[in-house]
Design a protein with these regions (language model features):
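Short catalytic/metal-binding and nucleic-acid-binding patches
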Residues: 1-135
Length: 135
């Protein structure tokens, strides 16, 4: 199935589940300092652009965000700025160049309250489902 153009999606919802994956599932967030940088950049960009982050998780090789904005058209620019900022940081500290993420991020509109609640629960439970932090 082909993706809807982002403009069509943005017309339907102000809430989104966003998934960003490392290129070839590379562990681009493996270290704590990398996760901290991503979360701090996310908070800064969100505040600058009027985006509210309702839930997030940063795993070793991907991140999930649940976001909303009064003007949904700012969400793609928010993600572009966030991922570009992180990619530049990652490449600089790893002394490398090239792509960090697998293409553009994936986004899914959350059209009902039930979808939103289910998605936030999924995001919060993602580390447990992956066996992270279990003894």
């Amino acid at each position: 199935m082909t993706r809807l153009p982002r403009t069509e999606i943005l017309d339907k919802s102000k809430y989104f589940h966003i998934l960003t994956c490392g290129l070839v599932r590379e562990n681009v967030f493996k270290e704590d300092n990398l996760k901290r940088f991503y979360v701090n950049a996310m908070a800064e960009k969100a505040a600058d652009m009027g985006v509210s982050v309702l839930a997030y998780v940063v795993m070793d090789n991907h991140s999930h965000l649940v976001v909303t904005a009064e003007d949904a058209n700012v969400v793609p620019e928010f993600m572009r700025r966030l991922n570009t900022t992180y990619a530049k940081f990652f490449n600089r500290i790893k002394n490398r160049s090239g792509y960090v993420f697998k293409g553009r991020y994936d986004s899914e509109p959350l059209l009902t309250a039930e979808q939103g609640e289910s998605c936030i629960t999924f995001v919060h439970n993602n580390p447990c489902a992956a066996g992270v932090g279990l003894f």
